[in-house]
Amino acid sequence: VRGITHLGGTILGTTNRGNPLKWPIRADGGAVTYMDRSQEVVDALERLEVDALISIGGDGSLEIAHALSQKGLKVVGVPKTIDNDLEATSVTFGFHTAVDTATDAIGKLHSTAESHQRVMVVEVMGRNAGWIALSSGVAGTADVILIPEIPYDMDIVCEKIQDRYASGREFAIVVVAEGAFPKGSKPLFKQEDDGQKRLGGMAEQVAHDIHERTGRETRHLVLGHLQRGGGP
Protein backbone atom coordinates (compact mmCIF):
# COMPACT_ATOMS: atom_id res chain seq x y z
CA VAL A 1 0.00 0.00 0.00
CA ARG A 2 3.04 2.27 -0.09
CA GLY A 3 2.20 5.45 -1.99
CA ILE A 4 -1.54 4.82 -2.25
CA THR A 5 -2.86 5.10 1.31
CA HIS A 6 -3.50 8.83 0.93
CA LEU A 7 -5.43 8.46 -2.33
CA GLY A 8 -9.20 8.49 -2.71
CA GLY A 9 -11.13 6.03 -4.84
CA THR A 10 -10.37 2.37 -5.46
CA ILE A 11 -7.05 1.76 -7.17
CA LEU A 12 -7.96 -1.81 -8.20
CA GLY A 13 -11.28 -0.74 -9.69
CA THR A 14 -14.70 -1.69 -8.42
CA THR A 15 -18.33 -2.18 -9.39
CA ASN A 16 -21.72 -2.36 -7.73
CA ARG A 17 -23.30 -4.07 -10.73
CA GLY A 18 -24.41 -7.66 -10.66
CA ASN A 19 -25.65 -9.67 -7.70
CA PRO A 20 -24.81 -13.40 -7.75
CA LEU A 21 -27.65 -13.98 -5.29
CA LYS A 22 -30.12 -12.62 -7.83
CA TRP A 23 -28.62 -13.04 -11.29
CA PRO A 24 -30.99 -12.01 -14.13
CA ILE A 25 -31.70 -14.57 -16.84
CA ARG A 26 -33.55 -13.28 -19.89
CA ALA A 27 -35.66 -15.79 -21.80
CA ASP A 28 -36.16 -15.69 -25.58
CA GLY A 29 -39.55 -14.07 -25.09
CA GLY A 30 -38.01 -11.25 -23.05
CA ALA A 31 -39.19 -12.43 -19.64
CA VAL A 32 -36.60 -12.09 -16.88
CA THR A 33 -36.14 -14.61 -14.08
CA TYR A 34 -33.52 -14.62 -11.34
CA MET A 35 -31.28 -17.36 -10.04
CA ASP A 36 -28.78 -17.78 -7.21
CA ARG A 37 -25.26 -18.24 -8.64
CA SER A 38 -23.36 -17.70 -5.40
CA GLN A 39 -22.10 -21.29 -5.34
CA GLU A 40 -20.39 -20.65 -8.68
CA VAL A 41 -18.53 -17.75 -7.04
CA VAL A 42 -17.35 -19.98 -4.21
CA ASP A 43 -16.29 -22.71 -6.65
CA ALA A 44 -14.37 -20.22 -8.81
CA LEU A 45 -12.49 -18.81 -5.82
CA GLU A 46 -11.57 -22.32 -4.71
CA ARG A 47 -10.23 -23.12 -8.18
CA LEU A 48 -8.12 -19.96 -7.98
CA GLU A 49 -6.88 -21.10 -4.55
CA VAL A 50 -8.16 -17.94 -2.90
CA ASP A 51 -8.03 -18.48 0.86
CA ALA A 52 -10.41 -15.70 1.87
CA LEU A 53 -12.43 -12.80 0.52
CA ILE A 54 -12.28 -9.24 1.87
CA SER A 55 -15.54 -7.48 0.99
CA ILE A 56 -15.41 -3.68 1.25
CA GLY A 57 -18.77 -2.03 0.79
CA GLY A 58 -22.26 -1.27 1.99
CA ASP A 59 -25.31 -3.37 2.73
CA GLY A 60 -25.46 -4.92 -0.75
CA SER A 61 -21.82 -6.00 -0.81
CA LEU A 62 -21.93 -7.30 2.74
CA GLU A 63 -25.18 -9.18 2.09
CA ILE A 64 -23.40 -11.06 -0.69
CA ALA A 65 -20.35 -11.59 1.52
CA HIS A 66 -22.54 -13.04 4.26
CA ALA A 67 -24.19 -15.44 1.82
CA LEU A 68 -20.77 -16.61 0.60
CA SER A 69 -19.62 -17.14 4.18
CA GLN A 70 -22.68 -19.34 4.75
CA LYS A 71 -21.37 -21.54 1.95
CA GLY A 72 -18.04 -22.04 3.73
CA LEU A 73 -15.94 -19.24 2.24
CA LYS A 74 -13.78 -17.32 4.70
CA VAL A 75 -14.91 -13.71 4.55
CA VAL A 76 -13.92 -10.40 6.16
CA GLY A 77 -16.48 -7.61 5.83
CA VAL A 78 -15.36 -3.98 5.90
CA PRO A 79 -18.18 -1.41 6.39
CA LYS A 80 -17.54 1.12 3.62
CA THR A 81 -20.44 3.38 2.68
CA ILE A 82 -21.15 7.09 2.81
CA ASP A 83 -24.71 6.30 3.97
CA ASN A 84 -23.60 5.23 7.48
CA ASP A 85 -26.50 2.75 7.56
CA LEU A 86 -24.79 -0.45 8.74
CA GLU A 87 -25.08 -2.17 12.09
CA ALA A 88 -22.15 -3.34 14.23
CA THR A 89 -20.19 -0.11 13.71
CA SER A 90 -20.77 3.43 14.94
CA VAL A 91 -19.45 5.14 11.80
CA THR A 92 -18.77 3.65 8.36
CA PHE A 93 -15.75 4.55 6.25
CA GLY A 94 -16.67 7.30 3.79
CA PHE A 95 -19.37 8.93 5.89
CA HIS A 96 -17.22 11.74 7.28
CA THR A 97 -15.82 12.55 3.82
CA ALA A 98 -19.34 12.85 2.41
CA VAL A 99 -20.44 15.05 5.31
CA ASP A 100 -17.41 17.31 4.86
CA THR A 101 -18.24 17.75 1.17
CA ALA A 102 -21.92 18.43 1.82
CA THR A 103 -21.17 20.84 4.67
CA ASP A 104 -18.75 22.78 2.50
CA ALA A 105 -21.36 23.09 -0.26
CA ILE A 106 -24.04 24.23 2.18
CA GLY A 107 -21.69 26.83 3.60
CA LYS A 108 -20.98 28.26 0.15
CA LEU A 109 -24.69 28.45 -0.63
CA HIS A 110 -25.30 30.74 2.34
CA SER A 111 -23.68 33.72 0.61
CA THR A 112 -25.59 33.39 -2.66
CA ALA A 113 -28.86 32.70 -0.85
CA GLU A 114 -28.44 35.81 1.29
CA SER A 115 -27.32 38.01 -1.59
CA HIS A 116 -30.36 37.14 -3.72
CA GLN A 117 -32.80 36.59 -0.83
CA ARG A 118 -33.54 33.08 -2.02
CA VAL A 119 -34.51 29.77 -0.53
CA MET A 120 -31.84 27.21 -1.47
CA VAL A 121 -32.82 23.52 -1.34
CA VAL A 122 -29.89 21.08 -1.29
CA GLU A 123 -30.35 17.35 -1.92
CA VAL A 124 -27.76 15.01 -0.42
CA MET A 125 -27.27 11.26 -0.67
CA GLY A 126 -27.89 8.62 1.98
CA ARG A 127 -30.65 6.50 0.44
CA ASN A 128 -33.11 5.61 3.21
CA ALA A 129 -30.89 6.97 5.99
CA GLY A 130 -30.76 10.63 6.96
CA TRP A 131 -27.29 10.70 8.51
CA ILE A 132 -25.63 12.81 5.80
CA ALA A 133 -28.51 15.29 5.66
CA LEU A 134 -28.73 15.62 9.44
CA SER A 135 -24.99 15.92 10.07
CA SER A 136 -24.21 18.30 7.20
CA GLY A 137 -27.37 20.30 7.84
CA VAL A 138 -26.48 20.87 11.48
CA ALA A 139 -22.84 21.64 10.66
CA GLY A 140 -23.86 23.96 7.83
CA THR A 141 -26.52 25.71 9.98
CA ALA A 142 -29.40 24.83 7.67
CA ASP A 143 -32.82 26.21 8.59
CA VAL A 144 -34.75 23.06 7.66
CA ILE A 145 -33.50 19.45 7.48
CA LEU A 146 -35.68 16.73 5.95
CA ILE A 147 -34.75 13.08 6.55
CA PRO A 148 -36.38 9.74 5.60
CA GLU A 149 -36.84 8.67 9.21
CA ILE A 150 -39.33 11.49 9.87
CA PRO A 151 -41.86 12.16 7.07
CA TYR A 152 -42.22 15.92 6.77
CA ASP A 153 -45.21 18.26 6.71
CA MET A 154 -44.86 20.89 3.97
CA ASP A 155 -47.10 23.30 5.88
CA ILE A 156 -44.63 23.27 8.77
CA VAL A 157 -41.66 23.64 6.39
CA CYS A 158 -43.20 26.70 4.74
CA GLU A 159 -44.21 28.17 8.10
CA LYS A 160 -40.61 27.91 9.27
CA ILE A 161 -39.37 29.68 6.13
CA GLN A 162 -41.97 32.44 6.38
CA ASP A 163 -41.11 33.01 10.04
CA ARG A 164 -37.45 33.37 9.10
CA TYR A 165 -38.23 35.99 6.44
CA ALA A 166 -40.55 37.81 8.85
CA SER A 167 -37.72 38.07 11.38
CA GLY A 168 -35.60 39.97 8.85
CA ARG A 169 -33.41 37.08 7.71
CA GLU A 170 -34.61 37.01 4.12
CA PHE A 171 -33.04 33.78 2.92
CA ALA A 172 -33.15 30.14 3.94
CA ILE A 173 -31.24 26.88 3.47
CA VAL A 174 -33.15 23.60 3.27
CA VAL A 175 -31.24 20.28 3.29
CA VAL A 176 -33.13 17.29 1.91
CA ALA A 177 -32.05 13.65 2.07
CA GLU A 178 -32.67 11.89 -1.25
CA GLY A 179 -34.92 9.39 0.53
CA ALA A 180 -37.03 11.96 2.40
CA PHE A 181 -40.76 12.12 1.72
CA PRO A 182 -43.86 13.97 2.98
CA LYS A 183 -46.44 12.46 5.30
CA GLY A 184 -48.82 10.14 3.49
CA SER A 185 -46.50 9.74 0.51
CA LYS A 186 -43.46 7.72 -0.57
CA PRO A 187 -39.87 8.51 -1.65
CA LEU A 188 -39.34 9.66 -5.24
CA PHE A 189 -37.50 7.45 -7.72
CA LYS A 190 -36.03 8.20 -11.13
CA GLN A 191 -35.79 5.67 -13.94
CA GLU A 192 -32.18 5.39 -15.15
CA ASP A 193 -31.04 4.47 -18.66
CA ASP A 194 -30.12 0.98 -17.46
CA GLY A 195 -33.68 0.40 -16.30
CA GLN A 196 -32.92 0.62 -12.59
CA LYS A 197 -34.83 2.93 -10.28
CA ARG A 198 -32.82 5.24 -8.06
CA LEU A 199 -33.82 7.69 -5.37
CA GLY A 200 -33.78 11.29 -6.50
CA GLY A 201 -35.81 14.36 -7.33
CA MET A 202 -36.77 15.44 -3.82
CA ALA A 203 -34.91 18.77 -3.91
CA GLU A 204 -36.71 19.80 -7.09
CA GLN A 205 -40.07 18.78 -5.64
CA VAL A 206 -39.51 20.53 -2.32
CA ALA A 207 -38.27 23.69 -4.06
CA HIS A 208 -41.36 23.71 -6.28
CA ASP A 209 -43.70 23.24 -3.31
CA ILE A 210 -42.01 26.00 -1.30
CA HIS A 211 -42.25 28.46 -4.20
CA GLU A 212 -45.89 27.57 -4.89
CA ARG A 213 -46.92 28.02 -1.25
CA THR A 214 -44.80 30.99 -0.19
CA GLY A 215 -44.03 32.83 -3.42
CA ARG A 216 -40.37 32.99 -2.38
CA GLU A 217 -37.73 32.70 -5.08
CA THR A 218 -36.38 29.18 -4.70
CA ARG A 219 -33.53 27.22 -6.25
CA HIS A 220 -32.51 23.60 -5.84
CA LEU A 221 -29.16 21.82 -6.07
CA VAL A 222 -28.39 18.10 -6.18
CA LEU A 223 -24.87 17.37 -4.91
CA GLY A 224 -24.91 13.84 -6.33
CA HIS A 225 -21.69 11.89 -6.77
CA LEU A 226 -19.54 14.82 -5.66
CA GLN A 227 -20.11 13.38 -2.19
CA ARG A 228 -18.49 10.08 -3.17
CA GLY A 229 -15.13 11.49 -4.23
CA GLY A 230 -12.10 12.91 -2.50
CA GLY A 231 -9.23 11.67 -0.40
CA PRO A 232 -9.71 9.96 2.95
Whereabouts are the PLM-identified features?
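Accessory alpha-helical/coil subdomains and C-terminal extensions
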Residues: A44, A52-G57, E63-A67, K74, ...
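Glycine-rich nucleotide/cofactor/substrate-binding loop typically near the N-terminus or early
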Residues: V1-E46
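Short beta-strand elements at the ligand-binding edges of bilobed clamshell
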Residues: A88-V99, G230-P232
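Extracytoplasmic ligand/sensor domains, especially the bilobed periplasmic-binding protein
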Residues: T15, A67, K71-E87, H96
